[in-house]
Amino acid sequence: MGRLLAKMLFPLAMCLFVSAVSASDSPSSNEANPIVISSEAMDYDTNTITVREGKKLMVSCVFESDEQIHKSDLLWKQANGNNIDGESNPSLFSVILNEKGSKHRKTSLHFSSVHTRDTGLYTCTGRTAGGENFEKTIKLVVLPAIEWNDKDTVKGALLGEPITIDCGVKGPSGKEPMIQMTNGNGEPLDEEIWTIAGNEATIDSLKKEHAELTVSCITIEMHQETSKEEFPVVDRKDVNIEVYTLPEFETEESVQYTVIDNHVRDAIIYCNVTHSFPPVRHYTFYHGDEEIKMSDKFNIFVNVGVSQGAHLKIHNVNENDLGTYKCEANNIKAKSYHTIHLREANAPAEPKVTLIEDKRHSIIWKVESIDRDPDLPMTAVEIRHLRAGTAEASGVSDEDISDAYWKSHSIFMQRNIKDDGIYEINGLRHGHEYVWRFRQINEAGFGDSVVLRAKTLDDHDLEMMDSASDSKFPLALATLFFVCLFI
């Protein structure tokens, strides 16, 4: 019987819950009284507002008259006669403004969170410029907060696992609560997805597409007003579904490479996650069965931004660092593993570098690979340059300048491999000589370098080029004239 009554009252209750009807539209409205009070969930027959403790509440009072009224003459008052203004207290205050779409004065009574102590009478009073006084009183009834069996508004489970939404409430003893369960749009739950038993709805096996679902738990309590009539009080709790997944990788295992020689090199081991919900929070790397701790040799960097993943940086890699690594990705709800095999590969061969053209503020180079059968394909070219004077200050020949000196004194750029091998380096000072270092890079690391010197053009060089160009024109003209004589 209770369920049947709930279904009959549900449309009426929802209508009252979501709409606010102007008191001037109610049968009890006094046409001579320009004060119109409105609020959600208000019974306009008795001018009573019934709400749950802890909720926000706003009550509007509009002075619907063409007569002038000063904003200080439209007031909300408590039952004891105290005015309620914008500074009454943080949880109860009023705001005065003009009604949208008209010039009528409006004062809004705001409860940031109603309490049972707020139960009582509230009066809106207005005094016109001509001295006429009007008022209208409402009764506020604050019911104890509803207690749900499950207070969570977000429920989640792993992909493939079951999930149950409990819409039950802890009602008074012997009183059966009236409960409806709908989707987020107010429609009945899809029985092809949900299994409904009592006040619980269950999905037997979560799928990724279920992450968009919402269950609205709606309770209807019939509250008896002073007039002995029952007024429906509607409460609603939306529960959003989350589908947790294992962190996923593009493949279960991968092979990565490094170069081991007399250079100080860093090896990078990547652990890229293609999908995880929630996002991965912790990454742990293992070499064999031993967990890797942060140190001067090992450092773990986590991606920041949209892409999920991390990488392990191994400083000054050597033969002992080769072997099998394991990356553990943990998103708090679940964890998964990716295996990486770190292997040794040959460094790229030194490139063939040709000066194509020197200009006033740039130099054009052609960088080609001479290795026809590399272990790994070339991915980039590293180009560094420094002024000749800076190179000479190192105290050694250009070829013997250390990596550390290059890193601290040179301008660095890394360009992706181009089919034509042409690279123009801009931003140079005119008439200056530079020392250049070129080396190719593959997945394993960098190769042997080529060191060259090249100079940008100065004003004298440009004048010489212009003169040479000018001298070629008369010669070409004379040649043309000579040819014409024999035609």
From Swiss-Prot:
Q: Which residues form the propeptide?
A: 467-487
Predominant cellular place of this UniProt entry's protein: other
Q: Where in the cell is it found?
A: Cell projection, Axon; Synapse; Cell membrane
Whether Cell membrane counts among this entry's keywords is yes
Q: From which residue to which does the signal peptide run?
A: 1-23
Pfam families attached to this UniProt entry: ig, Ig_3
Per its database record, what is this protein's job? Cell surface protein which plays a role in the plasticity of cholinergic synapses at neuromuscular junctions and in the polarity of the mechanosensory neuron ALM, possibly by antagonizing Wnt signaling.
Q: What is this protein called?
A: Neuronal immunoglobulin domain-containing protein rig-3
